[in-house]
Amino acid sequence: SYAASLAAAMQDYPIEHVIDAPFRFDGFDQTAVDTLLSQLVPERLNTWYISQEEPTDQELEFYVGPHSVEEVAAPDLTKALALVDRLGLELPSKNGLLPENFSIKASPAAVTPISVAENVTFWLKGSTHFDGLPKGFSRIQLSTDAALNDAQSAVYLSLWESLYDLKQTPLATEASIAGMSLSMGASNGISLTLAGFTDKQPELLERALTGLRVEPSELEFGQAVERLLRGIENSKRAFPYTRFTPLLSLLTRQGRYTDVALARAASKASLEGFNTFVDHVLGTSHVRGAFFGNYNEADVRGVYELLSSVVSASPSARYARSNIYAPKPATTLLLNREVPVEDLGMLY
């Protein structure tokens, strides 16, 4: 949780900087860096190898950890290089997302709507408290009501998110190294969220959009369905208090489905149906976006140009929002669930 992360940060940073420590670039200590690097020498190398069949002759002092310690013998470089060549290992490619331009752009102080196409509006706002940082947060939403009335569509959205996240792991890692983040969310449609340095966010978005139309193989799709079914089953064994919010939503919000309904829909899911659903969302959704931080209007319009190469925004669709149950006086809603763990929980 956020509170736990702040408590952990107190072990490493002064109290007054536990919140902004990841974003501060002052106080660089070249001597301290050189001292640390001087300790990273081959003589201090420790290599851990863990398996169930290793002989052991020692135990850890405070934990159960049988182990043994051996000196590392210098390898035969010729044989080692031959093994590397056989495995086809290569150095990673150059990270093309590393920021190069840290200039600050003129962003509006108030929320400013920008109409980029018919029925497509993006909102732009500069940061008040961090206006001197070359960073920003942007989110693009493709909104559809398909999952509000159909469990099968809800399942396809979950599978889309799972497959996209898996396929885009290398890109997300590259972005993280470059000081940015990339994530996809699926609810009433899908959303792409980018945050961090704004210099190379257009390049990151372009590559993220290239993989938006996920084209899994039959094997990859089957594995995604299996992960979803396993997740549904595992959720039943979570601590009961963690289930309160989903179960409350099941009672009070449109577009929420029981585990049985989701499992049944997942069992019926097909690759052909999934591809049809993806095409439907990309071609009929309501599109909107928000940009907060170091952006200007040209950046916003540039994002839509990239987006329009993959997504066809509907000129008539509206933002899909889940209906919420309106309480009635003297009416009580009751939901009981048996849990497969020796625990109980109550929310009222």
Can you describe what each PLM-predicted range is?
Residues 1-33, 48, 131-268, 284-293, ...:
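M16 family metallopeptidases and their MPP-like homologs
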Residues 2-23, 49-53, 60-159, 286, ...:
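His/Glu-based metal-binding/catalytic segments typifying zinc-dependent metallopeptidases
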Residues 31-37, 110-111, 125-129, 179-181, ...:
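Generic recognition of flexible, low-complexity loop/linker segments
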Residues 35-39, 43-48, 52-55:
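Extended, domain-scale alpha-helical bundle/helix-rich regions
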Residues 45, 245-248, 271-307:
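Non-catalytic, conformational "gating/processing" segments within enzyme and secreted inhibitor domains
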Residues 55-59, 149-151, 201-203, 297-302:
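Short, conserved charged micro-motifs
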Residues 59-64, 153-154, 158, 175-179, ...:
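Composition- and surface-driven signal marking solvent-exposed, interaction-prone regions
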Residues 209-218, 307-317:
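A common structural junction motif
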